[in-house]
């Protein structure tokens, strides 16, 4: 799938990828939709050099072929169900992927569910628990609660025993994400984010880890309510740089 001059997705016939020795050919069953895909559609996020020029960063599917190096250095086999992180090209019937960029589809997950593991879920896990060192009993602030990343990061943090504060733009959005399990949902149309974070800090819940995909004024408003030694992780600047 490619984009025309009007930024619409169009079907296009392309040749099947030819795998390199260290690559695996995967027949695609499902693909994730990420912010990067939307930006690429607008011409603001070019694919890495050497990657297909059509969209798609994460997929799930079934291995159809292995290069000789991939076969020798891995335990992957034809027919294995996998999900993969790509430089691009996931919106296609087949993709070529390095063997070490694959993960097995966990038992119990559908292909559609597995397609969000390599980029969306992995980003949330990496930033909360590896970069941010979030632990059970600590507080995570995850603004933009209805975003793709936050909708995964919130239940992920809760599953590991953390307390979660998030923010949204309206009461309707707050209701729509209530099932994610956040302890505090800030409706920024009615409440000031900094005021709520200050109240939480005074109640004994300073922010240990913030996973921020907004940027803009969010950092200045909220940084004073971080605990000493806390982690503020900026993933994106959707609300601007300053």
Regions found by a protein language model. Give the residues of each.
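Glycine-rich beta-strand-centered segment in the early N-terminal region that forms part
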Residues: 15-32, 44-89
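Surface-exposed amphipathic alpha-helices with a cationic face
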Residues: 150-159
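Adenosine-nucleotide cofactor-binding segment
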Residues: 142, 158-221
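Short glycine-centered segments of the SAM/dcSAM-binding site in methyltransferase folds
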Residues: 81, 139, 163, 230-231
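Glycine-rich NAD(P) Rossmann-fold beta1-alpha1 loop
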Residues: 121-122, 144-151, 212-216
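NAD(P)H dinucleotide-binding glycine-rich loop of Rossmann-like/cofactor-binding domains
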Residues: 39, 70-72, 81-144
């Amino acid at each position: 799938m490619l984009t025309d001059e009007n930024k619409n997705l169009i079907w296009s016939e392309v040749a099947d990828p030819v795998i390199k020795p260290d690559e695996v050919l995967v027949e695609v069953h499902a693909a994730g939709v990420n912010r990067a895909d939307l930006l690429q559609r607008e011409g603001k996020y070019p694919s890495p050099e050497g990657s297909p020029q059509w969209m798609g960063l994460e997929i799930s599917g079934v291995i159809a072929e292995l290069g000789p190096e991939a076969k020798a250095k891995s335990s992957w086999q034809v027919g294995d169900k996998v999900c993969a992180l790509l430089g691009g090209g996931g919106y296609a019937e087949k993709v070529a992927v390095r063997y070490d960029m694959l993960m097995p589809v966990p038992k119990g997950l559908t292909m559609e569910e597995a397609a969000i593991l390599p980029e969306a879920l992995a980003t949330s896990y990496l930033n909360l628990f590896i970069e941010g060192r979030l632990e059970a009993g600590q507080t995570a602030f995850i603004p933009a609660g209805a975003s793709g990343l936050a909708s995964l990061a919130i239940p992920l943090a809760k599953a590991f025993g953390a307390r979660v504060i998030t923010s949204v733009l309206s009461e309707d959005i707050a209701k729509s994400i209530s099932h994610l399990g956040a302890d505090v949902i800030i409706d920024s149309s009615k409440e000031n984010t900094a005021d709520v974070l200050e109240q939480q800090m005074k109640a004994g819940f300073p922010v240990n880890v913030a996973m921020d995909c907004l940027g803009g004024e969010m950092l200045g408003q909220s940084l004073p309510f971080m605990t000493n030694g806390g982690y503020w992780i900026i993933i994106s600047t959707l609300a601007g740089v300053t």
